[in-house]
Structure formats: structure tokens, C-alpha cells
Amino acid sequence: MASYKGLIVDVNGRSHENNLAHRTREIDRERLIVRRGQPFSITLQCSDSLPPKHHLELVLHLGKRDEVVIKVQKEHGARDKWWFNQQGAQDEILLTLHSPANAVIGHYRLAVLVMSPDGHIVERADKISFHMLFNPWCRDDMVYLPDESKLQEYVMNEDGVIYMGTWDYIRSIPWNYGQFEDYVMDICFEVLDNSPAALKNSEMDIEHRSDPVYVGRTITAMVNSNGDRGVLTGRWEEPYTDGVAPYRWTGSVPILQQWSKAGVRPVKYGQCWVFAAVACTVLRCLGIPTRPITNFASAHDVDGNLSVDFLLNERLESLDSRQRSDSSWNFHCWVESWMSREDLPEGNDGWQVLDPTPQELSDGEFCCGPCPVAAIKEGNLGVKYDAPFVFAEVNADTIYWIVQKDGQRRKITEDHASVGKNISTKSVYGNHREDVTLHYKYPEGSQKEREVYKKAGRRVTEPSNEIAEQGRLQLSIKHAQPVFGTDFDVIVEVKNEGGRDAHAQLTMLAMAVTYNSLRRGECQRKTISVTVPAHKAHKEVMRLHYDDYVRCVSEHHLIRVKALLDAPGENGPIMTVANIPLSTPELLVQVPGKAVVWEPLTAYVSFTNPLPVPLKGGVFTLEGAGLLSATQIHVNGAVAPSGKVSVKLSFSPMRTGVRKLLVDFDSDRLKDVKGVTTVVVHKKYRSLITGLHTD
């Protein structure tokens, strides 16, 4: 809203009705925010009618220094052009602007020019501005998604669930994306403005912002701070004392705010799910349908040979001292964004992998994607971007080698089906898990899978050979789902399927690791000789006590058990590996009473210490989109074993609708304890003489 002397008295951006029509009212009700490919209207208040033969012209400016100038046509022209029409000619003129579906996203400044018959500018009103976003509701937009329920989840939902753990023990954590929180949109454009391409040539960068492929790739590179002014610094092991430990974050908004307020200095620290969640926030805010993905048993194939090779000594200790070596992560998170790929052959539209975790350089930057999920499934590794790396993450072989004292290597196990399991995302229809593994690859062992492997250059093994190689001795690891703080048993079973007794040496090793396989210390080791009668099984129990693992367990509460069976006269040693996550209890979060916007409400959080030792330095962190910004409550004193701690916090909800309140608890000995509850915030009613009125 702005006032001018002369003919144009006032310009009204009609933000209330425009933002409602463009589904941007959650972002801001006062500033004008529109989506491309969809018309919007502004009103001119004039002191008089336009003089005879005078007319209006509209000019758009983009960039901090007006690097891009667009003249708006008076009548409907080409589909890729801006145009406007006007109604009324007295003291009020309604201007309706039509943007092309491939318009540049960004902050526009609009100048309204009153032109004389001879082409001179009589008056100029240029104080109105607006933001333009992608429009997944527009059929001609590259991000068009023709499913309203998916749009509500992948664009409009500010809360979500991210999956973690191991493929056979999947856990979830709540996350506050908060893409419509105050000034988050401004920070998202600030992220784009600080990319290397924008700093090098802002005009060219702005013009490319019409393309979601370009924007998605830019955001992927900018979410991590490797080599640029990116948002987050990654760190995968303690200490985190000069920043925030990755597991303590419960939402993206504090991260983005801290980055912006600190003068675009990177925030410490993130790991893969934090990188993915922040990218999801930015991309949803800009209007690109996006969802977080978790790939369990995710391969990091450094040398591109489609296999992950592990070198061990005879004590089962890793020998790979290379700075950059193959690894297998218990889980790895990235995002998928929905868009058409006009830069690629037909068949590559739809979900695209974007991975902001800094792992490998791509065109000189730490980014990955966008890579079509369809291309990964079909083994088309020549398409842009980074298809071989993504294909390996979900399809690589896993090979373990024993390096003997004389330097000779012995292959002890080769697994063609252990990577890329239970690929997961939150369902559109609730907080349960949707398995999308079959989006990435054909069923294990199918003919189609073997055809894809052959096309991608991965060695194909026929199923019959797999069975023949198993031999007469079989090795497996069994365990319950243990709770962190308790003692538990791991059972290693040796089965003898042959017709004679087997004599072997069994080595068992339990070690603490991080979720991305960094070793934190040995918990227990056991080597014994076993005799297994024909057609029988032998079970060996390794009991792990809390004192065995607490001194070295990581914040991910993960124990890796390896078992190696070496039987003279057999085909060779066999090995199996199990990753055992130690579960932690959830927080109890309650918000009693009716929630009404801008009226006080109290949240109650309680927690019982499950450990046999006191907890010191306890901190609760609460946040929720539309409810309250991230707030910490420190616990006074220690929490005794089996002791209960309770805290409460009063706040006033800021926005109506179904909201999530997220809580995290951390202490010296127990970290990453989460809780969540749903809060339905109602509109505020007040009684007037004429009846009821809704705020």
C-alpha cells in the first residue's frame, strides 16, 4: 500500500484476496505473495479519470540492482509473456496481471506508468512489490502435481516425520519444517542470492530461476556449507561443543534463522536428516512439491565400481585407513522433488532425487541431483545429474575381505541384496510409513532386476549360484529389540546342513558405531571353538551389559555385531553382520484444554529416566509451526535412576489449524529423546451486538 501525489493516489495490492486465491496466506497476510501462471489483481485509486488518449503501462523489475526488467504487455500474447488487462476508467482501476507458467520466481517491483499520447511518462507509481513462487496447481508449470492430497502434504504441510534406525528396526522422529513461519520465505530467497552463481552473475542467475531443476540443484548445494556460503556445516562425531549437536534439532526454522542473522555464516552442526529436512523446508516454501526419503542400508561407493568393499584383519578390525573409502550407512536421508525434466528424454519426469548432504563433488560443488527416480529404476545412468552415485546408494554389492598377515586378501562374504532396503517416506494419509523401494528398483531376484543391473554395468549373479555358494554351514545373528540402559543378549547361531559333524572357530565382535559406520569402540569380543553335529544347530550367547557399551556408544545408540566362522575343509570362512539399535523411551507431551489462537495455553512434558545412573544437564526443547518458536527449558539438578522429571511451558498459538508440538530432551548420558502431540487451534470468536464475529 502506497500513496502518491497526482493522478494515482493509492495502489492496493489486494494481498488478502490474492494470497487466499494463491494459497500463500499462511506465509503472510499483509505482503503480496503469488504463484506463477495464475492471475492476480491490484487496484489503482485515482484522483480523476485518465486524461484522453493517455494509457497505462506496467514494468517489472527483478534483482537488487534491477538486473532484469520486464515490460508487461497490454493484451494476451505468447504463453511465456506477462500481460495485463484493466477494468474501470474513473477514480478506481482494477488491473489484472497474468504471469507465464515459466515466470522467474523471486521478489518483483512493479512500476505503474501513466503514458502520454506521444509516449512520455506523465506519472510513475513504483512502490508496490510482490513475491512470485512456483505453482504446482498450474497445469503448465514444470512442478505441476495433479493430486490435491499430495499437494497438501508435499507443499502445504509444515510438519513431518523422518525415518531413522536400521532396515529391520525403523524408528521415526517428528520434524517441524515451518516453511510458512515468519520471514522463512525471505531467508529462502536469501539462500538463492548467496549461491556462487548468483554472486558471480546475478542477472544470469535470476533468469535461470524460472527452472525448478536449476533452483533445486542450487538449494542442494547451498544447504551444506562446503565451498560456499551454505547453511549447515556437517559433523559426524563428537564433540559438538562449539555448536548444536545434530540430534538436538527438531525443526528447520531455527537453523535458517541463525544462518541469516549471523550474516550467512554456516550453522553448526548437521547430519543427513538435518540437511534433508532443511532442503525440504526451502523447496516446499518456494512451491516445489518435496518429501524426505530415507534409504536404509545405504551405500557410499567412492570409486564408482558399484560395490562397497570392506577390508578387515583376522580380528575383524577395519584395515581401511583411506581418507575416502567405501562405506555403508545404516540409513541415509535425501529429498525427492516433483518436476518435469524438459532437459532430458521422455520418461524422466516426476520424482527427482536431491541430496544436500556433502558427500561427493558434482560439477565442482558438493551437491547431488536432481536425478530422476525413474532413471535409477531403469538403470539409465547417463542422465543428469549424478545417476551413477544414486544408483550405487540403492544397488551396490557389499563385499567383506579378510587381509591375512602375509597381505593376501580372502573374500569372505559377498551380498547382492543388502543395500537399499525399505526406502521410506511419510504417507500422505497420516503419520505412518510409506515404502517406496519399488520406485527405485525392481523386486530382488526378478528378471527385470537382472536386466537393469546388466544395463548399469553391475555384475549379474544368477539366483542358482547364490544357493550353491552358501555351503553346508550357515551363520546368523538374532537379538531382541534392546532398550538403552539395559543388559541384553545377542545369539549367534551356526547351522550345519551337511551330513557330518563340523568343527570351526567362531569369533564374535560387538562394537559401537555411528549411523554412518564410524567406529566408536569395542564393547566385547569372544572367540571359541565349536562343534556342530550334522543337521543340528549351535547357539552361542554374547551378553552385553550396560557398562560394556555405555563408555563407547555414540549418540545414535547403535551396536554392530560381527560373527566370523572359520571351518577347515569348508569353502572358506563365512561372516554375518547385524546392526542393533538401542531404543529410547518417548517423552509424554500433553496440552490439555481448548486451544484458541492468541490465547494462553500450557504444555506439560514428563519423562522417566530409564538408565541405572543419574542424568545431569538435562534440557528440553519445544517448538511447533504456528505454536511457538524453539524454546529451551533447563532441568535443575540431576534426574535419579527411575526418577521422573516434569516441566511445563505456557504459550499462545499464533495460527489456526492442526498443529504439532515437538519436544526434544538431551542430557549428559541420554540424548535424542523425542515426543510430539497434536494441537488443534481454533479461531477466536467474540460477541458483537450484531452477533458472532470471527477474527
UniProtKB/Swiss-Prot annotation:
<feature type="binding site">
    <location>
        <position position="434"/>
    </location>
    <ligand>
        <name>Ca(2+)</name>
    </ligand>
</feature>
<dbReference type="GO" id="GO:0006508">
    <property type="term" value="P:proteolysis"/>
</dbReference>
<dbReference type="GO" id="GO:0051260">
    <property type="term" value="P:protein homooligomerization"/>
</dbReference>
<feature type="binding site">
    <location>
        <position position="395"/>
    </location>
    <ligand>
        <name>Ca(2+)</name>
    </ligand>
</feature>
<dbReference type="GO" id="GO:0018149">
    <property type="term" value="P:peptide cross-linking"/>
</dbReference>
<dbReference type="GO" id="GO:0120295">
    <property type="term" value="F:histone serotonyltransferase activity"/>
</dbReference>
<dbReference type="GO" id="GO:0050568">
    <property type="term" value="F:protein-glutamine glutaminase activity"/>
</dbReference>
<dbReference type="GO" id="GO:0000785">
    <property type="term" value="C:chromatin"/>
</dbReference>
<comment type="subunit">
    <text>Monomer.</text>
</comment>
<protein>
    <recommendedName>
        <fullName>Protein-glutamine gamma-glutamyltransferase 2</fullName>
        <ecNumber>2.3.2.13</ecNumber>
        <ecNumber>3.4.-.-</ecNumber>
        <ecNumber>3.5.1.44</ecNumber>
        <ecNumber>2.3.1.-</ecNumber>
    </recommendedName>
</protein>
<dbReference type="InterPro" id="IPR014756">
    <property type="entry name" value="Ig_E-set"/>
</dbReference>
<dbReference type="GO" id="GO:0005739">
    <property type="term" value="C:mitochondrion"/>
</dbReference>
<dbReference type="GO" id="GO:0043065">
    <property type="term" value="P:positive regulation of apoptotic process"/>
</dbReference>
<keyword id="KW-0158">Chromosome</keyword>
<keyword id="KW-0547">Nucleotide-binding</keyword>
<keyword id="KW-0964">Secreted</keyword>
<feature type="binding site">
    <location>
        <position position="444"/>
    </location>
    <ligand>
        <name>Ca(2+)</name>
    </ligand>
</feature>
<dbReference type="GO" id="GO:0008233">
    <property type="term" value="F:peptidase activity"/>
</dbReference>
<keyword id="KW-0808">Transferase</keyword>
<dbReference type="GO" id="GO:0007200">
    <property type="term" value="P:phospholipase C-activating G protein-coupled receptor signaling pathway"/>
</dbReference>
<dbReference type="Pfam" id="PF00868">
    <property type="entry name" value="Transglut_N"/>
</dbReference>
<dbReference type="InterPro" id="IPR002931">
    <property type="entry name" value="Transglutaminase-like"/>
</dbReference>
<dbReference type="GO" id="GO:1904015">
    <property type="term" value="P:cellular response to serotonin"/>
</dbReference>
<keyword id="KW-0342">GTP-binding</keyword>
<keyword id="KW-0963">Cytoplasm</keyword>
<feature type="binding site">
    <location>
        <begin position="476"/>
        <end position="482"/>
    </location>
    <ligand>
        <name>GTP</name>
    </ligand>
</feature>
<dbReference type="GO" id="GO:0018277">
    <property type="term" value="P:protein deamination"/>
</dbReference>
<comment type="similarity">
    <text>Belongs to the transglutaminase superfamily. Transglutaminase family.</text>
</comment>
<dbReference type="InterPro" id="IPR008958">
    <property type="entry name" value="Transglutaminase_C"/>
</dbReference>
<dbReference type="Pfam" id="PF00927">
    <property type="entry name" value="Transglut_C"/>
</dbReference>
<dbReference type="InterPro" id="IPR038765">
    <property type="entry name" value="Papain-like_cys_pep_sf"/>
</dbReference>
<dbReference type="GO" id="GO:0120299">
    <property type="term" value="F:peptide histaminyltransferase activity"/>
</dbReference>
<keyword id="KW-0479">Metal-binding</keyword>
<keyword id="KW-0378">Hydrolase</keyword>
<dbReference type="InterPro" id="IPR036238">
    <property type="entry name" value="Transglutaminase_C_sf"/>
</dbReference>
<feature type="binding site">
    <location>
        <position position="449"/>
    </location>
    <ligand>
        <name>Ca(2+)</name>
    </ligand>
</feature>
<dbReference type="GO" id="GO:0005576">
    <property type="term" value="C:extracellular region"/>
</dbReference>
<dbReference type="Pfam" id="PF01841">
    <property type="entry name" value="Transglut_core"/>
</dbReference>
<feature type="active site">
    <location>
        <position position="272"/>
    </location>
</feature>
<feature type="binding site">
    <location>
        <begin position="578"/>
        <end position="581"/>
    </location>
    <ligand>
        <name>GTP</name>
    </ligand>
</feature>
<dbReference type="InterPro" id="IPR001102">
    <property type="entry name" value="Transglutaminase_N"/>
</dbReference>
<dbReference type="InterPro" id="IPR013808">
    <property type="entry name" value="Transglutaminase_AS"/>
</dbReference>
